[in-house]
């Protein structure tokens, strides 16, 4: 079972979606959740440190989720952060692109709390969290 004090950053340009993900994480016992509205905002927050997990949308202005993922993976300090992509992009090529860029997991919107929990648990298990 993962540490319930893990610090999550939820990245999505749609505030309602950020709130939904935040509330689902709270239902799962994770209360340490912050939000960012795009990849640029997310990177600024991530670089201040202290985050344990990123949940990111794909389609966002300024810097999309795939570019955010690639930037995180290329950053020495952030490179090992687990990143779960939560997106409406259900095409096989998108899922492959995210996997090749180093996504820890992929959830297609809309999704349930059970789906989110299952994906998180797989990532926690794989990373020994």
Curated annotation (Swiss-Prot):
The modification 4-aspartylphosphate is found at residue 57. The keyword Acetylation applies. One of its GO terms (molecular function) is metal ion binding. Its cofactor is Mg(2+). Mg(2+) binds at residues 12-13, 57, 59. GO terms for biological process: archaeal or bacterial-type flagellum-dependent cell motility; chemotaxis; phosphorelay signal transduction system. Phosphorylated by CheA or acetylated by acetyl-CoA synthetase, depending on which acetate metabolism pathway is available. Binds 1 Mg(2+) ion per subunit. The keyword Cytoplasm applies. One of its GO terms (cellular component) is cytoplasm. Involved in the transmission of sensory signals from the chemoreceptors to the flagellar motors. In its active (phosphorylated or acetylated) form, CheY exhibits enhanced binding to a switch component, FliM, at the flagellar motor which induces a change from counterclockwise to clockwise flagellar rotation. This is Chemotaxis protein CheY. It comes from Yersinia enterocolitica. The gene is cheY.
């Amino acid at each position: 079972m993962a540490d319930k004090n893990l610090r999550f950053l939820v990245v999505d340009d749609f505030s309602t979606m950020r709130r939904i993900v935040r509330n689902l994480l709270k239902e799962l016992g994770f209360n340490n959740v912050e939000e960012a509205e795009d990849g640029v905002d997310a990177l600024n927050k991530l670089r201040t440190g202290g985050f344990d997990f990123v949940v990111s949308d794909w389609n966002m202005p300024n810097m999309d989720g795939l570019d955010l993922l690639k930037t995180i993976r290329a950053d020495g300090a952030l490179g090992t952060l687990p990143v779960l992509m939560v997106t409406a992009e259900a095409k096989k090529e998108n899922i492959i692109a995210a996997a090749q860029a180093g996504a820890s997991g992929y959830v297609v919107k809309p999704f349930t709390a059970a789906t989110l929990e299952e994906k998180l648990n797989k990532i926690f298990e794989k990373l020994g969290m």
